[in-house]
């Protein structure tokens, strides 16, 4: 399996890429001047990065295919986007604006499915849970919020004036710099870092603070060890600290050790589980590969050459065997001969304009896969059906019938969930009324 490291900078140094095993430099993608957390490999099928002007007055989102160095698709949202994230399958792309608004696009069509006000100040980081059912956002205002994708698309909740988020964490006193989620499913924990020099461990299921870990310096970046016992914290004092997740005391310093990069501030981290390697980026434009067990330096990758070295502010690990794969969400743009999907729409379409914009969820029957695992809009399913109709083979006819049934079942499930929400809300309101009379 070929594993590639990609890295970007806040100045226009482009996106560098290297073979992780050999350190060989690969294709460089230009132009790119991305903010922190503004680079993502969408389903590991193509690259996307938000772009900011020097004064943050305008912004854009660029797409690159893996085979061409120049950006092929450019989108211009209504406001500058900082943080950018995609779910595992590459179905959705989510952007966090400087206003605190969050935008959710369907990748295959470019449609803006949902826009909502997430925070009081700019969104600094976004991350999906392992099963893609939850989105976690961090902000310059110090808050962290957990969003359920199903709840976001429940218009009944919005009409009732209910909060859209599942959890709201406000214990950080300064801007949130990074967020990671472990792989524990319903027992997962969230780890956040902030300019207040702390990392906090939160319970995702209980919605409460578990640990508060104080560090000697501001933590810019986080990475999780796959074992789930420790995490790595990249600091502004050029050190990478090792923090304990399962600390014995509720509060207090739980720093197990550190390794020094002997350079400038650590700005980003990534962990490659396939090779058990830790990758760091720093302000001096250097990408370092570490052995986390021995804490020894393995190799150095230079992002920018010459006198004009910009800080490395984003690192991603991409598995090239996955890049070559395709899934059903790619049908609509690949059928048009494009390597990557169309530009992102600026505005959310009014519901009354088309009922095809309804997002439906397809829970596989008798499957262990969570019901949140597959999200497709109805018009995207329609488009797939039309494309299959044009192909005309017996196999595609069978696939077309399957998609029709999937479409119908999704609409029925959407109606059932709507009724369940209404019934549950009615029960809660009745209980509150009974409690008030007592």
Curated annotation (Swiss-Prot):
Keywords: Coiled coil, Repeat, WD repeat
Residue stretches of each WD repeat: 36-74, 76-115, 118-157, 171-212, 214-253, 261-300
SUPFAM superfamilies, per the entry: WD40 repeat-like
SMART domains: WD40
GO terms for cellular component: Cul4-RING E3 ubiquitin ligase complex
Coiled coil: 394-434
Gene3D superfamilies, per database record: YVTN repeat-like/Quinoprotein amine dehydrogenase
InterPro entries: G-protein_beta_WD-40_rep, WD40/YVTN_repeat-like_dom_sf, WD40_repeat_dom_sf, WD40_rpt, WDR18/Ipi3/RID3
Name listed for the protein in its UniProt record: Protein ROOT INITIATION DEFECTIVE 3
Organism: Arabidopsis thaliana (Mouse-ear cress)
């Amino acid at each position: 399996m070929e594993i590639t490291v990609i890295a970007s900078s806040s100045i226009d140094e482009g996106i560098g890429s290297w073979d992780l095993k050999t350190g060989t430099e690969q294709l460089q993608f230009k132009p790119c001047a991305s903010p922190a957390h503004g680079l993502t490999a969408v389903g590991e099928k193509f690259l996307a990065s938000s772009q900011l002007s020097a004064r943050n007055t305008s912004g854009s989102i660029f797409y690159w295919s893996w085979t061409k160095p120049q950006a092929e698709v450019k989108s211009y949202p209504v406001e500058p986007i900082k943080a950018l994230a995609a779910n595992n399958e590459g179905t959705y792309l989510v952007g966090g604006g400087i206003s605190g608004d969050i935008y959710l696009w369907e990748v295959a069509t470019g449609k803006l499915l949902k826009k909502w006000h997430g925070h009081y100040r700019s969104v600094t980081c976004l991350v999906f849970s392992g099963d893609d059912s939850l989105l976690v956002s961090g902000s310059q205002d110090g808050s962290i919020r957990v969003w359920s994708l199903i709840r976001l698309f429940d218009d009944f909740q919005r009409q009732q004036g209910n909060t859209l988020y599942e959890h709201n964490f406000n214990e950080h006193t300064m801007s949130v710099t990074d967020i990671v989620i472990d792989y524990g499913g319903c027992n997962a924990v969230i780890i956040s870092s902030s300019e207040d020099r702390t990392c906090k461990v939160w319970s995702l299921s209980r919605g409460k603070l578990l640990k508060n870990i104080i560090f000697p310096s501001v933590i810019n970046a986080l990475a999780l060890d796959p074992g789930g016992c420790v995490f790595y914290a990249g600091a502004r004092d050029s050190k990478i600290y090792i923090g304990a997740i399962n600390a014995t005391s509720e509060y207090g310093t739980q720093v197990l050790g550190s390794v020094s990069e002997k350079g400038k501030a650590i700005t980003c981290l990534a962990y490659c589980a396939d090779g058990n390697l830790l990758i760091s980026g720093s302000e001096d434009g250097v990408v370092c590969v570490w052995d986390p067990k021995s804490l020894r330096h393995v190799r150095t990758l230079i992002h920018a050459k010459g006198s004009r070295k910009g800080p490395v502010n984003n690192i991603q690990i991409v598995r090239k065997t996955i890049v070559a794969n395709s899934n059903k969400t790619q049908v609509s743009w690949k059928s048009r001969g494009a390597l990557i999907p169309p530009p992102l729409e600026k505005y959310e379409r009014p519901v009354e304009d088309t009922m095809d914009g309804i997002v439906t969820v397809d829970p596989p029957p008798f499957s262990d896969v969570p019901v949140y695992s597959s999200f497709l809009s109805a018009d995207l399913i329609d488009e797939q059906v039309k494309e299959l109709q044009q192909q005309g083979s017996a196999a595609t006819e069978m696939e077309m019938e399957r998609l029709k049934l999937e479409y119908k079942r999704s609409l029925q499930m959407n109606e059932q969930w709507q009724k369940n929400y209404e019934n549950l809300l009615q029960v809660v309101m009745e209980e509150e009324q009974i409690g008030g009379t007592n």
